[in-house]
């Protein structure tokens, strides 16, 4: 089980090398005059409206970061380009320089930090399961010998395999290409449960044709800290991103952005998530750090 964020330290723990030691991302931005932001279809964090315009909680934060980059690099004409990724392609897109920031619902964990870097977490979720409301399933042991779907290339895949091994649940695990695909399998009766980050499950349920037909059940399997992702070993660029996240926190802007997306109706269907900021996120923002415990 992933533990809650630990070892909170003062903002000084984010001290990084001076911008003069800037890495490849800054050079790439100067050369192309463009910052490329990777976005996913994971409402309310990152998605597109009916006009295919990107929006969401993570997108708003990344746009603030983009303005800080523009100001720090003295590039008022810098363009912002959006690039669509999914749970599978988000890492390769970053490592192959197709995107400079990934702004969605990506979990910051030790395994991923071997290849990429993250800034300060802007959300914490927990893994639970979406089931049909009339299924009778209330907790994980009731998934024994059943078909379970989750989305490929997510942290939930390993989590379920580990749970299957340790608890001998004998579940048949299948993988959807996207969260929407995984939800559809439960909706159509092709899978009995869809374990995933609870906030994404609540969003998918709220957007469905019959929200009351689904329930979100199970004790939390893990805590998932979401962070903006960028390339590893690029301290100059990371310093700008971290500094802007710190500003958003200390100026209380992040709280206003959170309320916009989680406590008020959001487009395109004016759905209200009705999710006040949880204790874990609120507490972590008191002592912001990019260091999370796994």
Which residues fall in each region the model found?
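Extracytoplasmic small-molecule ligand-binding "clamshell" domains
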Residues: 22-102
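Flexible hinge/capping segments at coil-to-helix
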Residues: 26, 131-148
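Short loop->beta-strand "edge-of-pocket" segments that line small-molecule binding or catalytic clefts
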Residues: 34-41, 55, 141-157
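Beta->alpha turn/N-cap motifs
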Residues: 38-43, 83-88, 97-109, 133, ...
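Periplasmic-binding protein-like
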Residues: 40-41, 122-134, 198, 206-245, ...
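Ligand-binding cleft/hinge of the Venus flytrap
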Residues: 48-51, 63-78, 156-175, 205-210
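Short helix-initiation/N-cap motifs at beta->coil->alpha
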Residues: 75-92, 135, 173-184, 188, ...
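A ligand-binding cleft/hinge motif common to bilobed small-molecule-binding domains
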Residues: 89, 103-114, 159-164, 184-222, ...
């Amino acid at each position: 089980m992933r533990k809650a964020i630990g070892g909170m330290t003062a903002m000084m723990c984010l001290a990084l090398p001076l911008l003069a030691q800037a890495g490849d991302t800054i050079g790439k931005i100067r050369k192309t005059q463009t910052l490329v932001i990777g976005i996913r279809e994971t409402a309310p964090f990152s998605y597109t409206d009916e006009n295919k315009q990107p929006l969401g909680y993570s997108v708003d934060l990344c746009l603030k970061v983009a303005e800080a980059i523009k100001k720090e690099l003295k590039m008022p004409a810098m363009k912002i380009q959006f690039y669509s990724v999914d749970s599978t392609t988000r890492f390769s897109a970053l490592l192959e320089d197709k995107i400079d920031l990934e702004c969605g619902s990506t979990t910051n964990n030790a395994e991923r930090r071997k290849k990429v870097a993250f800034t300060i977490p802007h959300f914490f979720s927990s893994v639970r399961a979406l089931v049909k409301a009339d299924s009778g399933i209330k907790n994980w042991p009731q998934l024994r010998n059943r078909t379970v779907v989750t989305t490929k290339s997510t942290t939930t895949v390993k989590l379920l395999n580990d749970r299957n091994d340790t608890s001998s649940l004998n579940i048949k695990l299948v993988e959807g290409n996207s969260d929407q695909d995984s939800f559809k399998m439960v909706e159509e009766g092709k899978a009995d449960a869809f374990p995933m980050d609870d906030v994404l499950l609540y969003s998918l349920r709220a957007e469905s044709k019959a929200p009351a037909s689904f329930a979100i059940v199970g004790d939390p399997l893990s805590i998932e800290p979401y962070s903006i992702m960028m390339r590893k070993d690029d301290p100059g660029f990371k310093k700008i991103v971290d500094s802007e996240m710190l500003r958003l926190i200390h100026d209380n802007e992040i709280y206003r952005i959170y309320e916009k997306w989680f406590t008020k109706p959001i487009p395109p269907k004016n759905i209200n998530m009705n999710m006040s900021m949880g204790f874990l996120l609120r507490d972590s923002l008191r002592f912001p750090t990019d260091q999370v415990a796994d």
